[in-house]
Amino acid sequence: EPYRRQRQMCIRDRALIDTIRVELRQRYSFGYDYVAVAPGNYGLDFMKESYGYDLDMSVKCSNFIGETIDMAADMGFKRMLLTGHIGKLIKVAGGIMNTHSREADCRIELLTAFAFKCGVAPEYIKCIMDSLTTEEALAALKESGRLYEVMDYAMERICFYLDKRAKGRLEIDCIMYSNEFGELAKSRKAEKWFTLLAQEQAQPI
């Protein structure tokens, strides 16, 4: 029974990865050398309100961030924008490229470590470590007065691991947000994407 469940999961995962590959290939065939990627439509309203960007236009990578980077690079894409909720993207800050909870889930541990690194007071460190959700941990960070300092450091780590996976084959930018606090952090060149994407949305492929 455990073997059968594992095999079914592998089949489902492979089907999802094949779907991502088809979407990427279709986009590349239209002549685009850049692609916007998101784990899903979580944050759809935030992206529309903040940037005027419709997440429905992006390729949905589900939990397979690493596989998506590999496929995009192999196809010849030069640039990628990854947008996502902290619940998914904070895992990338620990080098986790498959963000499904059955693979790894150290969201709170990573946030606690980053808070400690940024000098957050011990009483807040304990609150963060005791949090049940990333939103709860963010509330403790906000109260500590170091939320955005910690988020900027988290984004540094996310970009480090994205670049490590890409191996210089494509440039990756990232925006991370939460339901309650909106935009948490973004990479240096992420803002420049939205002029490009707005032009594309005016003439959808």
Show the residue positions of the predicted features.
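Short, amphipathic C-terminal "tail helix"
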Residues: 171-202
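Charged, low-complexity, helix-prone segments enriched in Lys/Glu/Asp/Gln
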Residues: 7, 149-153, 190-191, 198
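Single conserved hydrophobic/aromatic residue that forms the stacking wall/gate
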Residues: 1-7, 11
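A structural signal for small-residue-enriched, beta-sheet-centric alpha/beta enzyme cores
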Residues: 12-152, 157-160, 165-169, 175-179
